[in-house]
From Swiss-Prot:
Any single Gene Ontology cellular-component annotation: cytoplasm
UniProt entry keywords in alphabetical sequence: Amino-acid biosynthesis, Cytoplasm, NADP, Oxidoreductase, Proline biosynthesis
Family: Belongs to the pyrroline-5-carboxylate reductase family.
Protein name: Pyrroline-5-carboxylate reductase
Pathway: Amino-acid biosynthesis; L-proline biosynthesis; L-proline from L-glutamate 5-semialdehyde: step 1/1
Enzyme class, spelled out: oxidoreductase
Source organism per UniProt: Helicobacter pylori (strain J99 / ATCC 700824) (Campylobacter pylori J99)
Location within or outside the cell: Cytoplasm
């Protein structure tokens, strides 16, 4: 059985492991390594994830393995890598293929931008590949699809761009959810009921968005001189649409520094 090696053990690594371990453990031997990989042991035990913890010494043995990089981008050169990987899957924001290939020898490279919804196998993940070897590529893409859906974009810069749509976006949507919950409280709902209504609204909206464009959803809800269009006019006057676009742009720009 082939080996899938996770380098890193932070929030994203844990989310991916939680959402995909049942599928991945049938296809791969799972390994986790990093500076202090034993830190993830309580999490593995709690979630009943079968993975081997490999302490880091002088170098990480990557030979003939699928290697998933899930640490901070600036730590790429802090590790020594020994051997040639079959595939390097990188979730390192702002790190291009050239930097990856200079640091790690591999037959295949895949750059991706997953999000924290990986823990429910609901990540929306933009991917781009280099040095495509069909059999290796298929297995690498299957790894990505084990924790959500996979959107193949045209170039590696577009993977970085997807921070706006599926990376930082969940934090921005959380701010929206929190604001709607507080709005409900202001209008007289208790906190529990308000949050429950917001959660179901998000669930319903996600279903609507599968079939319809955002503009069409707005059109179906708004009536002439109605309550919703009145509220939307306030949001437009306050520049909420532009603020979201600017926030996403600044997140992408910060990542590319």
């Amino acid at each position: 059985m082939e080996i899938l090696q996770f380098i890193g053990y932070g929030n994203m690594a844990q989310a991916i492991l939680e959402g995909s371990h049942e599928i991945l453990s049938k296809r791969f031997i799972l390994e986790i390594t990093g500076r202090n990989p034993e830190k993830i042991a309580p999490f593995l035990q709690e979630k009943n994830i079968q993975a081997q913890i490999v302490p880091y010494k002088d170098a990480i043995d990557i030979h003939q393995k699928f290697v998933f990089l899930l640490f901070k981008p600036y730590n790429l050169k802090d590790f020594n890598y020994q051997g040639q990987a079959k595939s390097v899957l990188s979730a390192l924001a702002g790190v291009n293929f050239e930097a990856l290939s200079n640091a790690i020898n591999s037959l295949h490279y895949l750059k991706c931008m997953p999000n924290i919804a990986s823990k429910f196998a609901l990540s929306s993940t933009a991917v781009c590949e280099k040095s495509v070897a069909p059999s290796i590529s298929e297995k690498a893409l299957n790894i990505i699809e084990s924790f959500g859906n996979c959107v193949r974009v045209g170039n590696e810069e577009q993977v970085d761009s997807s921070v706006a749509t599926n990376g930082s976006a969940l934090a921005f949507l959380s701010l929206v959810a929190s604001s709607l919950k507080d709005a409900g409280i202001r209008e007289g709902l208790n906190a529990k009921d308000s949050l429950e209504l917001v959660k179901m609204s998000f669930k319903g909206f996600a279903k609507l968005l599968e079939k319809e464009r955002p503009e069409m959803i707005i059109e179906q809800i708004c009536t002439p001189k109605g309550a919703t269009i009145e509220g939307l006019s306030v949001l437009e006057k306050k520049g909420v649409r532009g603020a979201f676009i600017k926030a996403c742009h600044e997140s992408v720009k910060k990542m590319r520094l």
